[in-house]
Amino acid sequence: MTSPDQLQTFSLRSIAVAAFGPTLLFGIGQGAILPVVALSARELGASVAVAALIVTLIGLGSWFFNLPASLVTLRFGERWSIVGAAVAAGLALAAAATSALAPNGLWLLAAAMVVVGMSGAVFGLARQKYLTEAVPVAFRARALSTLGGVNRIGVFIGPFAGAAAMQFFGISGAYWVGVVAMAAAALLSLTIPDLATPDAPLGGDAGSQPTLRSVAVSHAGVFLSLGMGILLLSALRSSRQVVIPLWADHLGMDATSASLIYGLSGAIDMLVFYPAGRLMDRKGRQWVAIPSTLLMGTALLLIPLTGSFVGLLLAALLIGFGNGISSGLVMTLGADFSPDRGRGQFLGLWRFMADAGSTGGPVLLSGVTALASLGPGISATGVLGFAAAAVFAVVLPRLKHRRNY
């Protein structure tokens, strides 16, 4: 429990540089390369389908490494896990930058993207675990919402930094921006003090350490109820990234118009994360969880009804607002229900479920679109928002006794 003295003396500003700086830099590194990975693959001789697959390797690497990431964090601690993840990502991006010179450049690029995804899993989990334990519960949602928002800002800045570098160094310039950003993230992360974790009981005898299996079994009720809401929310979020450009293309808009709509939606997204975190800290998580999913679900249902630039823009802004206020929600709920012993394992399982939803959302959109058309596919993803809201409305009040505060 947090003492009153800690609450009075704690300030997010006091940990801002060490806590959020590496996340901003890591986001810039990721954002710099995301627009060019497919182009690099095409230059190396990949078909369109293979190029798309290589892009998805980042997400797949992150998804499947969430569980091992919890063990890495347990073994090396938060600080060295964060530093190591940034170093590994930087080395992978350096390999990607030189893939055009390698005999099997396409394979090197693919392997590099897997490592970037794996590094992101370790970095994200260790960062979340660190803030969960370093920040008083009364500030938890604000801290984790800010963490999510800062990462989004970094991913937003990254493509512009990459584009500037490509003017001088060609397509490899984007990767070198990523290398520099990851190196800076690693150096800044060295200033993070390791936390004394409660994984070992007082008295020095560690006893039997919690395992992924034991944590999954003991918290099955949380994973199978609230975890379903997290899975649905993640599917909803990932679908929106695909829906906006696809519907813009369906309406016959050019790439510039589609990019403008997408960018404005992202700008709204980045403006509201801190007020949303403050609301969660003061009123409760459901005050953000339910409205955010309802807003995104409603906006997605409205998109097939739009027929103009203005109509799609308004729907996209609504999506951006809904997504923005949910920034940090997945991490906050994971922190709330994670046990003191086995927190890393719990968060690994939690993030695995979230990434499963992120992978499944576009798959649902693709499947329904193939069976019917794009409009029904988008509507199907919108229904996910209402399903997620229903889960949160029912489950959050019932699981209050399972929280760690």
Describe these PLM feature segments.
Residues A88-P103, L295-G307:
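C-terminal ends and interior cores of transmembrane alpha-helices
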